């Protein structure tokens, strides 16, 4: 799937796409009787949020895309270290999985590195749901969904793009490009933020989003 997407060739079938996951959100909103919502997502979640806004604009009060990209592979510009860490295969045992999580520090916020917290989060993730094939399916969904260039250029919803200046997995350029494509988008670049949202930055991120959504 990845090779076909990068070469812009016909794609083999995939279990689901970003559109399917965006449709899941619509289903949840219907169940909750919500006609509109502020749609926020980070990383792959930002891609799903973009697709939601594109395909369901009347249900979108605003779009908040965090450390994400517009479906243009050339904007990702991952460092070799970050990509190596992302593609590394974790051990299947709990202890090995937890220690392996430290490799992801390659693309996380260096200033706020916290190995103990990384281990605790990995332990929680393993205990909640260790399902490696899910990661493969998620990657397939991303690449199978293609470019959103023209669709984002035609988007007419209030949009906030947030991106870390130190992100080495999805480059700051990807955030800048996303904001450039969407008419009227607001771009906020965050100092010392990698491809994660460490606790010391929570206040700044929440305040930024709150100020934006309260105006909409």
Annotate the PLM regions:
Residues 96-137:
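Conserved alpha/beta-hydrolase catalytic His-Asp/Glu region
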Residues 155, 161-163:
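Short beta-strand/loop motif that positions the catalytic acidic residue
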Residues 185-216:
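Catalytic active-site module of serine/aspartate enzymes centered on a nucleophile-bearing elbow/loop
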